[in-house]
Amino acid sequence: MSENDSIKPHGGVLVNRITNVDPSGLFSITISEDLANDVENIADGIFSPLEGFLGQQDFESVISRGRLANDLAWTIPIVLDVDEETANKMKDAVDVLLQNPDGIGIAVLHVEEVYTFDKEKTAKGVYGTNDTAHPGVAYTMSMKDFLVGGKIDFIQRPNDTEIRKNRLTPKQTREAFAQAGWKTICAFQTRNPPHVAHEMLQKTSITTRDGVFVNPVIGKKKSGDFVDEVIVKCYETMIEHYYAENRCKLGTLHTQMKYAGPKEAIHHAIMRQNYGCTHIIIGRDHAGVGKFYDPMAAQEIFSDYPELDIAPVFFPAFFYCRKCLTYTTPKACPHDNDDKEQISGTALREMIQNGQAPSQFILRPEVAQVILDHPKPFVD
């Protein structure tokens, strides 16, 4: 079955950096699990048009303008940070073997440049703040002092694990969408288990499109977020019990949450365009954290990127109204807050921590049970 060609990858070409390069004798460094995920995402075209880690010109353009040096939309810097000792060694190396934490050589980096960067300027450019209470800012300030730019060649997948079983490449998703006969696909980005309002939102999107691609983020998250295994198992359970056959596809996206609000909303849209999605759901405070962003900023930023082929679908918050007897939105429901079953992430976490099953209007019973059965459903 041919790949879904209803939407082109960002930049026009789906990157493929998977090769058979011989790494024998190369200087090697070990990178974090999150950086290893970035390398694999580059290789598979999830980060198209990137073919490697950003060089200085592209890096500075991204943090100052939200675009690559060639003016193509790109809002989140994909970089490899190293300490001074490693940087000095890499300056003299043409090719470097990148090993994941398991010691597996996953890729060869073709070193093009090694450069320093201003951490405060970077944090301000990406996150809009230098407040270290923001997890993205704290991460940026903890980065090593040098960045290495260059293309990568991916040579070996990491070991298979349970959490990787739903990881799909853009080639695989495009083939799956084509096989299902889908021409219009709405992506749903999430870092949480599905509550019923999200289910209703996804099903609403299906009514005018061929299918929905549920794409949870798997990777490092902030304390208090749900752990990856819980998120995936909850979605598997909900899809099994509550979705029409051949209308929902689940695939995990292995990348670190940045909590960059509007900038990350654009990044999320670009990745889902590369997967073959024609639309993406963008809710209030998409990819936000705390009170750092205006709730509508993640929707408003799309007016700065009209050239994106993927179309954002803006939804207000859904809730259950006891008088309307349905899930609805503030635009459609005239009733008082006392009649509304609102969804509070804080309240939901407190209920689960106390072993209480949330209301069926908040979580499907089967989904709630998955969470309650897990010994440690939250990130420490």
Curated annotation (Swiss-Prot):
- Carries keyword Nucleotide-binding? yes
Give the top-rank taxon of the lineage listed in the UniProt record for this protein.
Archaea
Enumerate the UniProt keywords alphabetically. Answer: ATP-binding, Nucleotide-binding, Nucleotidyltransferase, Transferase
Using the record for this protein, list the coiled-coil segments as residue ranges, or answer none: none
Q: Which reaction does it catalyse?
A: sulfate + ATP + H(+) = adenosine 5'-phosphosulfate + diphosphate
Asked if the Swiss-Prot or TrEMBL record annotates the protein with the keyword Nucleotide-binding, the reply is yes
Please state the pathway this protein functions in, per its UniProt record: Sulfur metabolism; hydrogen sulfide biosynthesis; sulfite from sulfate: step 1/3
Please name the NCBIfam families in this protein's record: PRK04149.1 (NF003166), sopT (TIGR00339)
Q: What sort of enzyme, by top EC class, is this?
A: transferase
**What does the entry give for GO biological process?**
hydrogen sulfide biosynthetic process; sulfate assimilation
- Record-linked InterPro entries: ATP-Sase_PUA-like_dom, PUA-like_sf, Rossmann-like_a/b/a_fold, SO4_adenylyltransferase_pro, Sulfurylase_cat_dom, Sulphate_adenylyltransferase
EC nos: 2.7.7.4
Q: Name one GO molecular function term.
A: sulfate adenylyltransferase (ATP) activity
Q: What is this protein called?
A: Sulfate adenylyltransferase
Q: Which family does this protein fall into?
A: Belongs to the sulfate adenylyltransferase family.
